[in-house]
Amino acid sequence: VTKYLKDKETARFENAKQDVVQPGYGQYENDEDHNMQESNSVGQTSDGTSRYAKAGGYFIYTMKTAPNEDNVLEVTFRGADEGKSIKISVDGTVVYDEVLSFSKARAAVSDTDEYTVRIPVSADMIGDKTKVDVKFESGKADEDSAAAYNFIYMTKAYSTDTSLELTSSEGTVTKADDKSYTISVGKDVTSVDLTAKIA
């Protein structure tokens, strides 16, 4: 079941994906599609790929969108940047301005852990545009920004809920915990039809 749910989640993501850029890997940042513009930013390829803006700096990627639809910008951060800020704008409108807090993102992390933030970009903001400029900079003018790691994605908005919904032809189904369900039926019931559906 777990593999099936993971495959379903991956399929939803792939169907929704509009664009991807690999920060820190110049060949993909500077291609015709993404046309990176930057001032005082640093790309790295030593431990995965990443890019961050030095104090007062920035970097911008042109990214494809789904016009007239809600989109989502997916950015990966690391625990090593705990307490650093990052401000992200789409065509000049700030969509994310946060100080990274891994204690909020995960209960237990190490400095090599990564997590992905899904940032809504509304259909009103996108309008009929097929491309937007996505700008990354520090939220604090006198400090370096947090780094964006590995890949930055622009997707159509999609559901990430892969929970199971179970129904029974007889009795009731209750979720016991994250991995099990209980089916309660009358003592005279000899068989039930069980239907499983992904949310």
Regions of interest found by a model, annotated:
Residues 1-158:
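Extracytoplasmic
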Residues 158-199:
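Beta-rich interaction/scaffold domains
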